[in-house]
Amino acid sequence: YLNKEIVDEARTFGWDKVVYYEKPLLKKTRQLYAGQYGVALDSKEMPQHHLNQFGIKIDAFVKHHDSHAAAGYYTSGFKDAVILTVDAIGEWETVSISKGYNQKAIERMESIRYPNSLGILYSAFTQRCGLKPAEEEYILMGMAAYGTPKYKDNIYNDFVERKPFRLKRN
């Protein structure tokens, strides 16, 4: 989480509003659905709790994938763009496709929702290889360049329904 040095540096740039990168209550609905009751019901996991110690008030919340899309699009220099966001999970979305218009607006076109997540599948393979999920995926990615895809069809057949994209449940 945040520390004093990071907050002090951010304050040197100034700000008009503090916008948080996900909608915590929407995220908690997904955590409850997934059976993560301890985290979902813990008020210390609410973002404002972490910011109170720095005297910072959150002015607005945006969906996690919208914040990824905005960060990529508004810093890209493109007037119009198609924006692909893929990560383990936002509140519910795991993959989203959006359109950016005239550097003024972003519209969500399609999304894939939890529990269907390429990112979570990738983290599971990371853990299966003895690495730390949500931290060491880059090691697995680097090792992949030296392997051969001899188990690719088995992985697809065992874990993935292709149309529409879904992860098989066990």
Predicted feature descriptions by range:
Residues Y1-N170:
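Short acidic/glycine-rich loops and adjacent helix/strand connectors
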